[in-house]
């Protein structure tokens, strides 16, 4: 079986039981893992739906430009669809969003304009206002307006809700989801409550957002609004996609609890999820008294952790905000968590062909080069390939002729953040001398240690 294009792979995401992190909850808790969508987030669903509906209505014309205010995930969904359908994209976002999100959008050819966070939505500098101005100024442009475009929630009514109902065989008793634009929770809730009105829908909000108080009092209180760090949930206004009548309860979660829980999910469940997932799980645990044995709780995991490597998965970032005590993961921890595999080296007088055979037989991508037991350089797959292209006879030459500078050495107390920063396209590993032996740490080892 194959698909005609990447857009056809959107949806039908897996449901995974949570075990360790929910051990104090008597109910069965299932995570709806939306990171398997092509853009690694749930927003792919509604991005495609908004575009398709705009095409049908004539609002989005061939060769047009899509302009949207987005924190990254909706932009990714729109950008992927735009590539396939032949549109251009201009996105506005806030300066609190992670750099990884902006880099990902630009990778798909989108233009990204970064705006200040701490201004009112009506301020001409806000990312809402800038996107609206661009819509007026750019010819043949269309603004999806994910907050008020009801195609957003309709996507989840048509797709995500039915998937959850079928995957749980109609046994779901509670839905837990973060609330940002409101499309995800409202669309799913509408479908599920049509199937079973007794299903409880629990929204997770953040401090600095207006949702919880508005639900409980009917009052839009601007005093509730203040800057917050959590990404993907909460707002300082009321999007039309938030259907408060379908949400039975809002639970607020602090920035700190959300950030730390994001990391805990990776370490306890092996799921590399984003910041709003941390909020949702922290909210779930705060609400544990609502659940009893026999209940089946579905919690939405909206996006992937790769977009938060510079934030929630960065210990220095957490420590700078007072979220983390000074308990750094170090090179020592990485070595302890590695499989007991002895490092492979090659003497500088060995031939390039011998290096090729070693790399192939051991399925590795790099080898430290030694001379009389001392590390003096390295040889990688790309070094070999580039040399062979220039001179095919190089295979019979000694490795020292094509080796490059050695991988950098670090000590056992070097933090995982510093190691991560040192591993790049030029240095795909670092070396450690421990107990008279040389150890190698790759990006895979770093990820494995973080997730352990």
Indicate where each model-derived feature is located.
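Short hydrophobic beta-strand motif reused across regulatory alpha/beta modules
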Residues: 370, 377-384, 439-446
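Structural motif
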Residues: 68-69, 92, 115, 178, ...
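Residue-level signal for well-ordered, solvent-exposed loop/turn and beta-edge residues enriched
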Residues: 59, 374, 436-437
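A short, polar/charged loop-to-alpha-helix boundary motif
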Residues: 383-400, 446-452
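The conserved cystathionine-beta-synthase
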Residues: 344-363, 369-371, 388, 408-427, ...
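Bateman (tandem CBS) regulatory domains
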Residues: 246, 328-343, 396-407
């Amino acid at each position: 079986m194959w698909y005609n294009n990447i857009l056809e792979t959107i949806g039908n995401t897996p449901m995974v039981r949570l075990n360790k992190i929910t051990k104090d909850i008597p109910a069965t808790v299932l995570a709806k893992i939306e990171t398997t969508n092509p853009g690694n987030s749930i927003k792919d669903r509604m991005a495609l739906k908004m575009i398709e509906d705009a095409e049908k209505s004539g609002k989005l014309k061939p060769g047009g430009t899509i302009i949207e205010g987005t924190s990254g995930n909706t932009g990714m969904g729109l950008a992927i669809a735009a590539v396939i359908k032949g549109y251009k994209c201009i996105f506005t976002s806030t300066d609190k969003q992670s750099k990884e999100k902006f880099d990902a959008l630009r990778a798909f050819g989108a233009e990204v304009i970064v705006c200040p966070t701490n201004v009112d939505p009506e301020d001409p500098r806000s990312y809402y206002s800038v996107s609206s101005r661009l819509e007026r100024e750019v010819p043949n442009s269309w603004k999806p307006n994910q907050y008020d475009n009801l195609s957003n929630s309709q996507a989840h009514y048509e797709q995500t809700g039915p998937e959850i109902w079928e995957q749980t065989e109609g046994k779901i008793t509670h839905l837990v989801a973060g609330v940002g634009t409101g499309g995800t929770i409202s669309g799913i809730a509408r479908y599920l409550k049509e199937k079973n009105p007794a299903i409880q829908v629990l929204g997770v909000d953040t401090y600095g957002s207006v949702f919880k108080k508005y639900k409980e009092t009917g009052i839009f209180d601007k005093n509730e609004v203040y800057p917050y760090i959590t990404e993907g949930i909460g707002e300082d206004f009321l999007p039309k996609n938030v259907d408060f009548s379908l949400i039975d309860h809002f639970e607020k979660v602090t920035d700190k609890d959300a950030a730390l829980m994001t990391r805990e999910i990776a370490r306890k469940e092996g799921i590399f999820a984003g910041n709003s997932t941390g909020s949702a799980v922290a909210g779930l645990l705060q609400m544990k008294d609502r659940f009893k044995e026999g209940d089946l709780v579905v919690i939405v995991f909206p996006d992937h952790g790769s977009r938060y490597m510079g934030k929630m998965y960065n210990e220095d970032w957490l420590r700078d905000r007072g979220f983390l005590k000074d308990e750094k993961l170090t090179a020592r921890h990485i070595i302890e968590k590695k499989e007991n595999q002895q490092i492979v080296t090659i003497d500088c007088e060995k031939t390039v062909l011998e290096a090729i055979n070693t790399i192939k037989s051991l399925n590795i991508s790099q080898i430290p080069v030694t001379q009389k037991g001392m590390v003096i350089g390295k040889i990688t797959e790309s070094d070999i390939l580039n040399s062979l292209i220039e001179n095919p006879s190089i295979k019979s030459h000694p490795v020292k002729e094509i080796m490059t500078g050695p991988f950098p050495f670090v000590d056992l107390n070097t933090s995982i953040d510093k190691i991560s920063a040192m591993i790049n396209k030029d240095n795909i590993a670092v070396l450690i001398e421990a107990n008279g032996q040389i150890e190698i740490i790759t990006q895979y080892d770093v990820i494995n240690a973080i997730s352990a």
